[in-house]
Design a protein with these regions (language model features):
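Long, low-complexity, Lys/Arg-enriched
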Residues: 1-109, 118-181
């Protein structure tokens, strides 16, 4: 059985949006990685501090699936210019190198659907030049079109959204696909 490790930037639709998994949580549901590395910008750190929404949902998913996720938070509290493409490639490359060394027996999954376009672009590029031990995974929206943001992300009730997440069923739709670099 293949072991997986997930590296994911975190974006505004994580962990749950419109009563469906955000990309990061959906990849966890489908691939069941042993370790999950979450990369948070200043704004995402503020949400994390408020209600621990990312770890909360991953741990609840683990309870639902009977799977233990080892979650690591990478906080970048000074990162505000998340739109700048030049910021991410070098740092992501180094982080992923460390992850690969620590988990040499695992396949690394890169979430190329969460975060800003610059974050996703850097991860897609790293996957394209890295070979077979890294898989870029994209996750389609439930509607297969642009996400409508119905909830107020600042007044987010993580317990409510977990309870009413429509993907918490055995017959959920797998929206993951491997990106062909």
């Amino acid at each position: 059985m293949t072991k997986y490790v997930l590296f994911s930037a975190i974006g505004g639709t994580d962990p749950i949006s419109n009563f469906r998994d955000g990309s990061m949580l959906h990849i966890c549901r489908v691939y069941k990685p042993e370790s999950v590395y979450l990369y948070l910008s200043k704004e995402m750190c503020e949400f994390h501090d408020k209600d621990d929404r990312y770890r909360f949902c991953i741990h609840r998913l683990g309870e639902l699936l009977g799977h233990k996720f080892d979650v690591h938070i990478i906080e970048r509290r000074d990162l505000v210019d998340v739109h700048k493409f030049d910021l991410f490639y070098k740092e992501y490359r180094e982080l992923i190198k460390e992850i690969r060394e620590k988990h040499s027996d695992a396949t690394v999954i890169l979430n190329v659907s969460s975060g800003t376009p610059s974050m996703k672009g850097a991860l897609q590029f790293i996957a394209a030049v890295s070979g077979d031990s890294i898989i870029p995974v994209q996750v389609s929206t439930p509607a297969k079109k642009i996400n409508e943001h119905r909830e107020n992300i600042k007044d987010y009730d993580v317990h409510f959204y977990w309870e009413y997440n429509k993907d918490n069923t055995k017959d959920f739709e797998n929206r993951c696909s491997k990106s062909e670099s």
